[in-house]
Amino acid sequence: MEKVALAEAFDSFDEQWSPRLAGELNGQAVKLAKAEGEFVWHHHEDADELFLVVSGELTIELREDSDIVLQEGEFVIVPRGVEHRPVTDSEAEILLFEPSETRNTGNVESERTKTDLEQLD
């Protein structure tokens, strides 16, 4: 068992939209990511996805519903199959919780797709 200090973990990398694996439990992954600008529209066919904003502000744009704006300390769970796009005007630090095999771009293959996540030290 090792504790994770979120501030130190986020300070250990700078790359945007490139999740880092912070831990795993019961087939679920805890991922940390820095975000700025627009991500890709995508959905996850078989997995719900939790977005928790640690710092900054993040908007989850939705094709078929109203966008959800998350402030620091707020989270939302995007149900499986719901097309969404995370967007932020300035850098946000986010924690993601989802099944370990979930690909960051879901059903979309792009230059931002990450298949082998870097483990935090």
Show the residue positions of the predicted features.
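A cytosolic small-molecule/anion-sensing beta-strand core signal
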Residues: 26, 54-55, 71-72, 90
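Short acidic-glycine-tyrosine-enriched beta hairpin
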Residues: 64-81
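Short, conserved beta-strand element in jelly-roll/cupin
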Residues: 34-35, 44-63, 97
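Short acidic/polar mixed-charge low-complexity motifs
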Residues: 28-29, 58, 66, 82
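Ligand-binding loop in jelly-roll beta-barrel domains
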Residues: 80-108
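A short, N-terminal "cap"/entry segment at the start of jelly-roll beta-barrel domains
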Residues: 1-31, 109-121
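Conserved short histidine dyad/triad with adjacent acidic residue
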Residues: 15-16, 29-45
